[in-house]
């Protein structure tokens, strides 16, 4: 219907001129004659080959070899017969096109008829006085319309017949190769000389070399060792994996080729693979693994081990720094019983000891008190001596009576003596430890050659009872009979709570030299 409307759009003069001025039916008739001659040639060759096969099977060549030869030639014989029939059909279709052209040429209004119609119409219009030619003019115009419709219908009919004839001509197929069933290597070579992909040919040659000719791949025929890819159904064999790899390679090559030429067909091809081809091979693999579970365990063990390693590394991201270990507090070091200098710190009372010779008489044993464990170290200068029994009335007269602590009861004399002996032993241990450390300490040597100048206000002088003799400033005499101080000595206050306010010093010291200040 569409073609008829297209032909109707043009006047009949155009169709008549094109149809009658073209090359005519000559070329189409020549093509029909050529197809007919080719069909007769194919028929003759097929007849000759059939006679030869019959003679081979019936003559002296009869036997398995003759039967194998006949079986190898039968596909080619069938192709010859089919090609002869196809050529005859093509010739017949072209002859039908020639007949349609002849019919269209006969039915088409000629250019002379169309010119006569136009001439008649012009004359009647020119002589149409007072409308006397109105009816003849209308008849002439109706005849022109008839020729218009006839030309369009003729062209539409000719087009339909020609298209149908051309479409019905069978396509030519390439002839099959005459091969025996065990001649796959020659088959592969002939394929290489054909239109196979060069990459596929290279892979086929590599497979053949690596396997020593045991794997023959024909990319064009889609076979491995003469069998199609789908003939290999056992994943437990190496040939199944080779066939699947080669099949996937060709499938993706075909998909890429179609993607550039016909994208719709390419995606249809991919859908067919996903729905029908790949599930079949996956089912074969799943069935084989179900029948051999030990292989599945062996295949999954490395993967599971890898996942365990990854999870172990992931645990490193959650490491929290451990809080610093707080060292346990060391036990309180035993501080030797050394009394501070008067005025440097507030000392506590120490156990009473026997007064040195020549010193003032000490208080009764009941007035002595024990010292605290944490006694500040004494400053340099005079030996630490304090006199007096603590603040008197005039020192802290405003202190409430309730805030004063009651004096402890008198200790046993034996306990006081034991405490004094323990303090002496402890002092000796401290001195021995200090002496050892002096021999092994790492210190920088001070290379000052000048005499050390004591700080201002400090006097580094004392009396020594051992070693090379007395040390200290001039005028100091050593008295071997002076006993070593044993602690804080407190003198008793009088009835007005006014005790001595000066420390008790050794009687051998020359106070006059000290008072001179040099």
From Swiss-Prot:
PANTHER family: GLUTAMINE-RICH PROTEIN 2
GO cellular component: extracellular region
Pfam families to which the protein is assigned, alphabetical: PPE, PPE-PPW
Name the UniProt record assigns to this protein: PPE family protein PPE11
Lineage, highest ranks first: Bacteria, Bacillati, Actinomycetota, Actinomycetes, Mycobacteriales
Chief subcellular location: secreted
GO biological process, one term: response to host immune response
Species name: Mycobacterium tuberculosis (strain CDC 1551 / Oshkosh)
Region Disordered, annotated ranges: 177-197, 346-375
Gene encoding the protein: PPE11
